[in-house]
Amino acid sequence: KKQYLIQPGDLVSVSWSSRISNQLGFFKIELIETTVGKIFNDKIRLDIISSFCSLTSFILPERENCPFFFQKSKTFLKEIPINPSNNEVLKLYIFWELDLLNEVGTPLNFSECTVSGDKKNLKYVSPKSGNAVGSSFAGKYENKLLKLPFFLGGVNVINNNENDDIFSGFSLTLFFIKKFLDTFDFNNLTKLLFARIRLQNNFK
């Protein structure tokens, strides 16, 4: 009866009850706070919600409690309709994807160079380890390394504008999301990641 009131990205309270625990029961769903209703005419933020819901639906393990990640996701969802800057919301979304990767056991470390331990002049990310690499240690592997955006702790490259930086962030997290999904031998990553790829392409 209340299906029309609830949209993807909304915060709801869900309870399940049954006369006997091993029999079929029913769910009671109450809307706590809407997100989509506040951004209905904002295409990029609707794309963010679509990607958010898509990734959580097939990446997070079923029936596993994720209290800390839930709180981070809740905080992010609340930010979507109130933050005046689309670019800032997109950056927050990329941080959320990093939290998602961490939640499923694929943490990325941008705090120091994986070769030297230096915390300065970080420019790349190793596609193998997910760790940052300093600009002086790329060597002959430079073309194989991923770019570390400025807003994620990378060096501020001359003539690199904010949109380029955000797109590099999208490319970085998408690489590791695909790498994680490859471990499960999904046959059609493009279909599974349709909403996520659409978000990145529409921003581009």
Walk through the language-model features, giving the residues of each.
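Non-catalytic alpha-helical scaffolds and adjoining flexible linkers that form interface surfaces
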Residues: 1-204
